[in-house]
From Swiss-Prot:
UniProt keywords, alphabetically: DNA replication, DNA-directed DNA polymerase, Exonuclease, Hydrolase, Magnesium, Manganese, Metal-binding, Nuclease, Nucleotidyltransferase, Transferase
Gene name of the encoded protein: dnaQ
Binding locations of a divalent metal cation 2: D12
Molecular function terms, GO-annotated: 3'-5' exonuclease activity; DNA binding; DNA-directed DNA polymerase activity; exonuclease activity; metal ion binding
Catalytic activity of the protein: DNA(n) + a 2'-deoxyribonucleoside 5'-triphosphate = DNA(n+1) + diphosphate
Pfam families listed in its UniProt record: RNase_T
GO CC annotations on file: cytosol; DNA polymerase III complex; DNA polymerase III, core complex; replisome
Biological process per Gene Ontology, one example term: lagging strand elongation
Protein name stated in the entry: DNA polymerase III subunit epsilon
Function: DNA polymerase III is a complex, multichain enzyme responsible for most of the replicative synthesis in bacteria. The epsilon subunit contain the editing function and is a proofreading 3'-5' exonuclease. Contacts both the beta sliding clamp (dnaN) and the polymerase subunit (dnaE), stabilizing their interaction.
């Protein structure tokens, strides 16, 4: 029987906004960090939560997502003031983050601004993208945090606005459910029904236009496209290309 201790930190951030072109983090700042500690698949209550003064204004679009106002952040510490405590908290742990590229990009950017030669986060933490895990488990389905809550019947009624600590707490429950065993029979049957319906629809299209060559996107192309849409939707609040 293994006695190894597994320490995971489920983490989320809120920011002043994001760039649609180029590096999504450049010129923007983290304004909230929420992290939940999980040891051997148990929530410990040893959480990390802080609001940060960004020394720049919050974009209106980002404010619409998380509701964190410029005035509220005026008396909060800067990232530089909490960086050491934050690094000590996450060092050596497995970070579980939904759409990890977004948050890790911001974290590495903030560390680089300190001019202290701090290495990339993935050199002192293992990084697990829970969105990538969900996509492997449920290909072709919506795998946003809200969609996963509905799938696993996890209460997210308090999530009227995005908040880093609340989102981290919800994600911790979701991730434990995702990695804890098989899903319910009802959900499995629902998935099979949807798959059968999808296959039937494809067959009808082929019969009606048998001479038309249909070129489908590869799995890699679909994954890359969905990743970009998730990045836009996660911190933009909405995505034009999704209903």
């Amino acid at each position: 029987m293994s006695t190894a201790i597994t320490r995971q930190i489920v983490l989320d951030t809120e920011t002043t906004g994001m760039n649609q072109i180029g590096a999504h983090y450049e010129g923007h700042k983290i304004i909230e960090i929420g992290a939940v500690e999980v040891v051997n698949r148990r929530l410990t209550g040893n959480n990390f939560h802080v609001y940060l003064k960004p020394d720049r204004l919050v974009d209106p679009e980002a404010f619409g997502v998380h509701g964190i106002a410029d005035e509220f952040l005026l008396d909060k510490p800067t990232f530089a003031e909490v960086a050491d405590e934050f690094m000590d908290y996450i060092r050596g742990a497995e970070l579980v983050i939904h759409n990890a590229a977004f948050d890790i990009g911001f974290m590495d950017y903030e560390f680089s601004l300190l001019k202290r030669d701090i290495p990339k986060t993935n050199t002192f933490c293992k990084v697990t993208d829970s969105l990538a895990v969900a996509r492997k488990m449920f290909p072709g389905k919506r795998n946003s945090l809200d969609a996963l809550c509905a799938r696993y019947e996890i209460d997210n009624s308090k999530r009227t606005l995005h908040g880093a600590l609340l989102d981290a707490q919800i994600l911790a429950e979701v991730y434990l459910a995702m990695t804890g065993g098989q899903t319910s029979m009802a959900f499995a049957m629902e998935g099979e029904t949807q798959q059968q319906q999808g296959e039937a629809t494809i067959q009808r299209i082929v019969r009606q236009a048998s001479k038309l060559r249909v070129v489908f996107a590869t799995d890699e192309e679909i994954a890359a496209h969905e990743a970009r849409l998730d990045l836009v939707q996660k911190k933009g609040g909405s995505c034009l290309w999704r209903a």
